[in-house]
Protein backbone atom coordinates (compact mmCIF):
# COMPACT_ATOMS: atom_id res chain seq x y z
CA UNK A 1 0.00 0.00 0.00
CA UNK A 2 1.14 3.52 -0.75
CA UNK A 3 1.23 6.35 1.78
CA UNK A 4 -2.18 8.03 1.99
CA UNK A 5 -3.05 11.55 3.15
CA UNK A 6 -6.36 10.81 4.86
CA UNK A 7 -7.21 14.42 5.70
CA UNK A 8 -7.70 13.65 9.41
CA UNK A 9 -4.68 15.76 10.35
CA UNK A 10 -6.65 18.92 9.47
CA UNK A 11 -9.07 18.19 12.30
CA UNK A 12 -6.65 16.60 14.76
CA UNK A 13 -6.56 19.47 17.25
CA UNK A 14 -10.36 19.66 17.37
CA UNK A 15 -10.44 15.90 17.94
CA UNK A 16 -8.01 16.19 20.85
CA UNK A 17 -9.98 19.05 22.38
CA UNK A 18 -13.17 16.98 22.43
CA UNK A 19 -11.79 13.89 24.12
CA UNK A 20 -13.67 13.27 27.34
CA UNK A 21 -16.87 14.98 26.19
CA UNK A 22 -20.19 13.15 26.26
CA UNK A 23 -20.30 12.22 22.57
CA UNK A 24 -16.79 10.75 22.63
CA UNK A 25 -17.24 8.89 25.91
CA UNK A 26 -20.44 7.31 24.58
CA UNK A 27 -18.65 6.24 21.43
CA UNK A 28 -15.62 4.77 23.19
CA UNK A 29 -17.62 3.01 25.89
CA UNK A 30 -20.12 1.45 23.50
CA UNK A 31 -17.44 0.22 21.11
CA UNK A 32 -15.54 -1.32 24.01
CA UNK A 33 -18.63 -3.11 25.35
CA UNK A 34 -19.65 -4.35 21.92
CA UNK A 35 -16.20 -5.75 21.18
CA UNK A 36 -15.95 -7.39 24.62
CA UNK A 37 -18.94 -9.58 23.76
CA UNK A 38 -16.81 -11.24 21.07
CA UNK A 39 -13.36 -11.10 22.66
CA UNK A 40 -12.80 -12.98 25.94
CA UNK A 41 -9.89 -12.09 28.18
CA UNK A 42 -8.33 -15.53 27.78
CA UNK A 43 -6.34 -16.57 25.97
CA UNK A 44 -4.45 -13.27 25.46
CA UNK A 45 -4.68 -12.13 21.83
CA UNK A 46 -2.32 -10.25 19.54
CA UNK A 47 -4.14 -7.01 18.77
CA UNK A 48 -3.39 -4.37 16.14
CA UNK A 49 -5.09 -1.00 16.61
CA UNK A 50 -4.96 0.86 13.28
CA UNK A 51 -5.10 4.61 13.86
CA UNK A 52 -4.84 4.04 17.60
CA UNK A 53 -4.77 7.78 18.36
CA UNK A 54 -4.64 8.57 22.06
CA UNK A 55 -4.95 4.86 22.90
CA UNK A 56 -8.38 4.62 24.54
CA UNK A 57 -9.30 1.21 23.11
CA UNK A 58 -5.75 -0.13 23.04
CA UNK A 59 -5.20 0.53 26.74
CA UNK A 60 -8.51 -1.06 27.68
CA UNK A 61 -7.47 -4.23 25.88
CA UNK A 62 -4.00 -4.17 27.42
CA UNK A 63 -5.59 -3.92 30.88
CA UNK A 64 -7.50 -7.10 30.05
CA UNK A 65 -4.24 -8.91 29.32
CA UNK A 66 -3.97 -8.69 25.54
CA UNK A 67 -0.76 -7.83 23.67
CA UNK A 68 -1.50 -4.64 21.76
CA UNK A 69 0.33 -2.92 18.91
CA UNK A 70 -0.86 0.61 18.18
CA UNK A 71 -0.01 2.31 14.91
CA UNK A 72 -0.69 5.95 14.11
CA UNK A 73 0.85 8.61 11.89
CA UNK A 74 0.38 11.43 14.41
CA UNK A 75 3.29 12.32 16.68
CA UNK A 76 0.98 14.38 18.92
CA UNK A 77 -1.55 11.60 19.41
CA UNK A 78 1.15 9.02 20.09
CA UNK A 79 2.58 11.38 22.70
CA UNK A 80 -0.89 11.53 24.27
CA UNK A 81 -0.96 7.73 24.21
CA UNK A 82 2.42 7.51 25.96
CA UNK A 83 1.27 9.98 28.62
CA UNK A 84 -1.83 7.90 29.30
CA UNK A 85 0.25 4.72 29.37
CA UNK A 86 2.62 6.24 31.93
CA UNK A 87 -0.29 6.45 34.36
CA UNK A 88 -1.02 2.73 34.02
CA UNK A 89 0.53 -0.09 36.06
CA UNK A 90 3.83 -1.29 34.59
CA UNK A 91 2.39 -4.61 33.45
CA UNK A 92 -0.15 -2.80 31.26
CA UNK A 93 2.54 -0.73 29.54
CA UNK A 94 4.60 -3.88 29.01
CA UNK A 95 1.81 -5.27 26.85
CA UNK A 96 1.78 -2.27 24.49
CA UNK A 97 4.00 -1.51 21.51
CA UNK A 98 3.64 1.76 19.61
CA UNK A 99 4.60 2.23 15.98
CA UNK A 100 4.53 5.56 14.18
CA UNK A 101 3.39 4.78 10.69
CA UNK A 102 0.86 5.38 7.96
CA UNK A 103 -2.27 3.23 7.89
CA UNK A 104 -1.66 3.02 4.16
CA UNK A 105 1.57 1.08 4.72
CA UNK A 106 0.45 -1.65 7.10
CA UNK A 107 1.67 -4.53 4.96
CA UNK A 108 5.15 -2.98 4.94
CA UNK A 109 5.13 -2.72 8.74
CA UNK A 110 3.71 -6.10 9.75
CA UNK A 111 3.82 -9.72 8.59
CA UNK A 112 0.86 -11.61 7.16
CA UNK A 113 -1.49 -13.29 9.67
CA UNK A 114 0.42 -11.76 12.58
CA UNK A 115 -2.62 -10.54 14.57
CA UNK A 116 -5.63 -12.23 16.15
CA UNK A 117 -7.60 -8.99 16.36
CA UNK A 118 -7.46 -5.88 14.16
CA UNK A 119 -9.23 -2.69 15.22
CA UNK A 120 -10.05 -0.16 12.51
CA UNK A 121 -12.29 2.25 14.37
CA UNK A 122 -13.08 5.67 12.97
CA UNK A 123 -10.39 5.37 10.30
CA UNK A 124 -12.00 4.04 7.14
CA UNK A 125 -14.05 7.21 6.59
CA UNK A 126 -10.86 9.17 5.90
CA UNK A 127 -9.84 6.92 3.00
CA UNK A 128 -11.38 7.94 -0.34
CA UNK A 129 -10.81 4.35 -1.50
CA UNK A 130 -11.19 1.95 1.44
CA UNK A 131 -10.28 -1.12 -0.60
CA UNK A 132 -6.50 -1.19 -0.01
CA UNK A 133 -6.94 -0.74 3.76
CA UNK A 134 -9.48 -3.56 3.88
CA UNK A 135 -7.05 -5.68 1.84
CA UNK A 136 -4.35 -5.01 4.43
CA UNK A 137 -6.62 -5.89 7.36
CA UNK A 138 -7.49 -9.21 5.74
CA UNK A 139 -3.81 -9.85 5.03
CA UNK A 140 -2.69 -9.17 8.61
CA UNK A 141 -5.52 -11.00 10.36
CA UNK A 142 -4.89 -14.64 11.25
CA UNK A 143 -7.53 -17.23 10.29
CA UNK A 144 -10.30 -17.15 12.88
CA UNK A 145 -9.25 -13.65 13.93
CA UNK A 146 -11.61 -10.76 14.63
CA UNK A 147 -11.88 -7.44 12.78
CA UNK A 148 -13.62 -4.55 14.56
CA UNK A 149 -14.57 -1.90 11.99
CA UNK A 150 -16.27 1.36 13.01
CA UNK A 151 -17.59 3.60 10.21
CA UNK A 152 -20.00 6.47 9.58
CA UNK A 153 -23.42 5.09 8.76
CA UNK A 154 -24.03 5.82 5.09
CA UNK A 155 -27.65 4.67 5.35
CA UNK A 156 -28.54 7.46 7.78
CA UNK A 157 -26.61 10.57 6.78
CA UNK A 158 -29.77 12.69 6.80
CA UNK A 159 -30.51 11.94 10.47
CA UNK A 160 -28.09 14.39 12.09
CA UNK A 161 -28.99 17.49 10.05
CA UNK A 162 -32.67 16.56 10.15
CA UNK A 163 -32.76 16.24 13.93
CA UNK A 164 -30.88 19.53 14.20
CA UNK A 165 -33.47 21.24 11.99
CA UNK A 166 -31.09 21.87 9.09
CA UNK A 167 -33.60 20.87 6.45
CA UNK A 168 -31.59 21.85 3.38
CA UNK A 169 -28.64 19.73 4.52
CA UNK A 170 -30.96 16.87 5.45
CA UNK A 171 -32.44 16.86 1.96
CA UNK A 172 -28.98 16.96 0.36
CA UNK A 173 -27.81 14.04 2.50
CA UNK A 174 -30.21 11.55 0.93
CA UNK A 175 -28.23 9.49 -1.54
CA UNK A 176 -24.89 11.02 -0.51
CA UNK A 177 -21.91 8.94 0.56
CA UNK A 178 -19.83 11.73 2.11
CA UNK A 179 -20.28 14.46 4.70
CA UNK A 180 -18.40 17.12 6.67
CA UNK A 181 -17.86 15.89 10.21
CA UNK A 182 -17.78 17.68 13.55
CA UNK A 183 -14.03 18.30 13.37
CA UNK A 184 -14.43 20.03 10.01
CA UNK A 185 -13.06 17.28 7.78
CA UNK A 186 -14.77 16.06 4.62
CA UNK A 187 -15.18 12.32 5.15
CA UNK A 188 -16.77 9.28 3.56
CA UNK A 189 -19.61 7.10 4.85
CA UNK A 190 -20.23 3.37 4.36
CA UNK A 191 -23.49 1.54 3.80
CA UNK A 192 -23.71 -1.60 5.89
CA UNK A 193 -24.59 -3.95 3.02
CA UNK A 194 -21.72 -2.63 0.90
CA UNK A 195 -19.17 -2.90 3.71
CA UNK A 196 -20.37 -6.37 4.65
CA UNK A 197 -19.89 -7.48 1.04
CA UNK A 198 -16.46 -5.81 0.83
CA UNK A 199 -15.30 -7.64 3.96
CA UNK A 200 -16.67 -10.95 2.65
CA UNK A 201 -14.71 -10.56 -0.58
CA UNK A 202 -11.62 -10.45 1.62
CA UNK A 203 -12.64 -13.60 3.54
CA UNK A 204 -13.93 -11.70 6.58
CA UNK A 205 -17.53 -12.56 7.43
CA UNK A 206 -19.62 -10.20 9.55
CA UNK A 207 -20.90 -12.04 12.63
CA UNK A 208 -22.66 -9.10 14.28
CA UNK A 209 -23.19 -5.39 13.82
CA UNK A 210 -24.17 -2.57 16.15
CA UNK A 211 -25.21 1.05 16.06
CA UNK A 212 -23.23 3.64 18.01
CA UNK A 213 -24.73 6.98 19.14
CA UNK A 214 -28.41 6.62 18.42
CA UNK A 215 -29.59 9.20 20.96
CA UNK A 216 -26.55 11.37 21.67
CA UNK A 217 -25.21 12.15 18.21
CA UNK A 218 -26.83 15.57 18.07
CA UNK A 219 -25.68 16.89 21.45
CA UNK A 220 -23.21 19.76 21.22
CA UNK A 221 -19.62 18.67 20.69
CA UNK A 222 -18.55 20.50 23.85
CA UNK A 223 -21.16 18.85 26.10
CA UNK A 224 -19.43 17.66 29.25
CA UNK A 225 -20.18 14.48 31.14
CA UNK A 226 -23.22 14.51 33.40
CA UNK A 227 -23.20 13.02 36.89
CA UNK A 228 -22.33 9.32 37.06
CA UNK A 229 -25.91 8.11 37.55
CA UNK A 230 -27.11 10.00 34.48
CA UNK A 231 -24.13 8.86 32.42
CA UNK A 232 -24.80 5.22 33.22
CA UNK A 233 -28.47 5.66 32.26
CA UNK A 234 -27.39 7.17 28.93
CA UNK A 235 -24.98 4.31 28.28
CA UNK A 236 -27.62 1.68 29.10
CA UNK A 237 -30.09 3.29 26.70
CA UNK A 238 -27.46 3.67 23.97
CA UNK A 239 -26.25 0.10 24.41
CA UNK A 240 -29.78 -1.28 24.14
CA UNK A 241 -30.55 0.85 21.08
CA UNK A 242 -27.25 -0.14 19.48
CA UNK A 243 -28.28 -3.79 19.32
CA UNK A 244 -32.00 -3.36 18.67
CA UNK A 245 -33.83 -2.74 15.40
CA UNK A 246 -34.96 -0.30 14.13
CA UNK A 247 -32.88 2.01 16.34
CA UNK A 248 -29.44 0.72 15.40
CA UNK A 249 -30.22 1.24 11.71
CA UNK A 250 -30.26 5.04 12.16
CA UNK A 251 -27.23 5.33 14.46
CA UNK A 252 -24.53 7.80 13.50
CA UNK A 253 -21.89 5.06 13.44
CA UNK A 254 -21.89 1.38 12.53
CA UNK A 255 -19.69 -1.14 14.32
CA UNK A 256 -19.14 -4.36 12.39
CA UNK A 257 -17.55 -7.45 13.96
CA UNK A 258 -16.14 -9.77 11.31
CA UNK A 259 -14.24 -13.06 11.55
CA UNK A 260 -11.49 -14.12 9.16
CA UNK A 261 -12.31 -17.43 7.52
CA UNK A 262 -10.36 -20.44 8.64
CA UNK A 263 -8.01 -21.97 6.10
CA UNK A 264 -9.58 -24.97 4.42
CA UNK A 265 -7.24 -27.94 3.91
CA UNK A 266 -6.70 -28.77 0.27
CA UNK A 267 -8.55 -31.94 -0.63
CA UNK A 268 -6.50 -34.50 -2.50
CA UNK A 269 -8.04 -36.20 -5.50
CA UNK A 270 -8.24 -39.96 -4.89
CA UNK A 271 -5.81 -41.89 -7.02
CA UNK A 272 -7.37 -43.83 -9.84
CA UNK A 273 -7.01 -47.62 -9.61
CA UNK A 274 -4.64 -49.09 -12.17
CA UNK A 275 -6.32 -50.19 -15.36
Regions found by a protein language model. Give the residues of each.
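Class I SAM-dependent methyltransferase SAM/SAH-binding core
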Residues: 56-106
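A short SAM/SAH-binding and catalytic strip from SAM-dependent methyltransferases
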Residues: 117-129
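A short glycine-rich, Lys/Arg-flanked "PGG" loop and its adjoining helix->strand segment in the class I
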Residues: 131-146
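Short alpha-helix
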Residues: 185-203, 209
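A short acidic, Gly/Pro-enriched loop at the edge of an enzyme's catalytic core
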Residues: 108-117
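A C-terminal cap/extension of S-adenosyl-L-methionine-dependent methyltransferases
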Residues: 208, 212-275
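Conserved class I S-adenosyl-L-methionine
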Residues: 1-43, 56-60, 77-80, 102, 146-174, ...
Amino acid sequence: MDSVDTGFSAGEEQWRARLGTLREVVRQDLVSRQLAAHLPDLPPRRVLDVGCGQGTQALRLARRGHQVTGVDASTRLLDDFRAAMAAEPAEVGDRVRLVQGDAGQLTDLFAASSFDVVLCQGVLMYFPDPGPLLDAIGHLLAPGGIASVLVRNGDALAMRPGLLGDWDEAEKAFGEDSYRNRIGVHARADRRADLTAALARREMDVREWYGVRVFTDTVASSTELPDEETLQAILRAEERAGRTDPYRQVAALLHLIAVRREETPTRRTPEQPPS
